[in-house]
Design a protein with these regions (language model features):
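Membrane-proximal, proline-rich intrinsically disordered regions
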Residues: 21-83
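Bacterial Sec-dependent N-terminal signal peptides
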Residues: 1-30
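Generic low-complexity segments that are intrinsically disordered, proline-rich and/or Lys/Arg-biased
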Residues: 1, 365-368
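Generic alpha-helical segment signature
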Residues: 7, 47, 115-118
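Structured, solvent-exposed acidic/aromatic patches
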Residues: 88-358, 362, 366
Length: 368
């Protein structure tokens, strides 16, 4: 009998002890400094959290050292080569995009990273920031969505725009998607031009220049993007293009970006072209040389270094390259590599290299 009493007492003691331990169970199992849901509610952080990922995803760059290759396969080895902006000098790439033999892994990267990394955050921002409750964040979400996905549509044509992540999602034609771009931009413009203040986006904004992280500046960006897209469809839908261009340029809608100090970029994020240039895999394309030199574009000296005649990429005197003498003197000239040139990579050592290593990422409105 005594044994039973003692056993019962021990069990009750254990239960009481366990109960006292679990009184603070949530505290014991939390991490000091964790960004909890409760903390995210302060200063509207719950609503703002998705925007960092979205802004970094337009010109894809996570900002972490060692991730430049993602930008390279999304943008530099695809659109930049195909459009004649740059040419790589990696000899192993000569059988791929720079000679018009498209690499499926590179050409699919834009879709994979946008829909795997950026679109979930856009969907979160759409769900969190309704027009009624959070009009400013709602408008900026729409602008960023268009800024992100117009680039994807220009790669692939039909894309997933509406209904992402739902059971009935389906691709929409490029014609339909462009109409949706204009609808969303019009909604954003109407919200922003009538916005009377309240919440701020400044703490989450790293696309507008410091001192201009305001709804008025986002309004200008929306109009500039609207004008850009109108120009894109001018040859296939001239009436739509005219309507949208006039709306974008209507002073009553807030104006467009016009001055150098209004440059839209990704401020504070390392330019991935600097990393790619460090691998000696991005040189000026001859097509870009033709435009920049032909129009005496003042940006030429900021974008590229002049060629070095008779020197290899390490600066050593090298009058013969791969056993072949230099055909002409191009020292101190700005020379690009002709698209489709499939020669040994050390033949490119004299051409103009990019100088973008210390410049913030180019503004989304100027990217192909």
């Amino acid at each position: 009998m005594n044994k039973i009493k003692y056993t019962t007492a021990l069990l009750l003691g254990g239960l009481l002890s366990f109960s006292s331990c679990t009184d603070n169970f949530a505290d014991f199992n939390s991490t000091d400094g964790a960004y909890t849901e409760e903390l995210q509610k302060y200063d509207n952080q719950t609503n703002l959290v998705p925007f960092a990922t979205i802004q970094k995803g337009i010109i894809y760059q996570t900002g972490v050292d060692g991730t430049d290759w993602q930008y390279q396969v999304i943008q530099n080895l695809v659109a930049d080569m195909f459009c004649g902006y740059f040419h790589d000098m990696n000899g192993s790439f000569n059988a791929n995009n720079s000679t018009y033999n498209l690499n499926n892994g590179w050409t699919s990267a834009m879709w994979i990273y946008t829909y795997g990394y950026v679109m979930p955050s856009i969907a979160d921002a759409e769900a969190l920031n309704t027009e009624k409750e959070w009009p400013l964040y709602h408008a900026i979400t729409k602008i960023l969505k268009v800024a992100t996905l117009h680039r994807v549509s220009d790669y692939y044509g039909p894309i997933l725009y509406d209904g992402f992540g739902t059971a009935d999602q389906k691709p929409q034609s490029q014609e339909e998607v462009y109409k949706r771009f204009f609808e969303d931009l019009e909604t954003a413009v109407n919200i922003l031009k009538d916005y009377k203040g309240g919440v701020s986006f400044e703490s989450a904004d790293f696309m507008m220049p410091e001192g201009k992280r305001t709804p008025a500046q986002w309004l200008k960006f929306a109009n500039s993007l609207r004008l850009r897209l109108a120009m894109r469809v001018s040859n296939v839908a001239p009436e739509l293009a005219e309507k949208q261009a006039k709306a974008a340029l209507d002073a009553a809608n807030g104006g467009v970006l016009e001055t150098a100090n209004e440059t839209v970029g990704e401020y504070g994020i390392r330019n991935p072209l600097g990393g790619v240039a460090g691998w000696s895999e991005v040189y000026m394309n001859a097509s870009l040389e033709s435009f920049l030199k032909g129009y005496n574009d003042p940006r030429l000296k900021s974008y590229f270094n002049p060629a070095q005649d008779g020197r290899d990429k390490d600066g050593n005197i090298n009058k013969e390259v791969a056993g072949v003498k230099q055909l002409s003197s191009i020292e101190d000239e700005y020379k690009g590599v002709r698209q489709g040139t499939g020669v040994a990579d050390n033949r490119y050592s004299t051409h103009s290299q990019t100088t973008l290593s210390l410049i913030h990422i180019s503004e989304p409105t100027r990217q192909a």
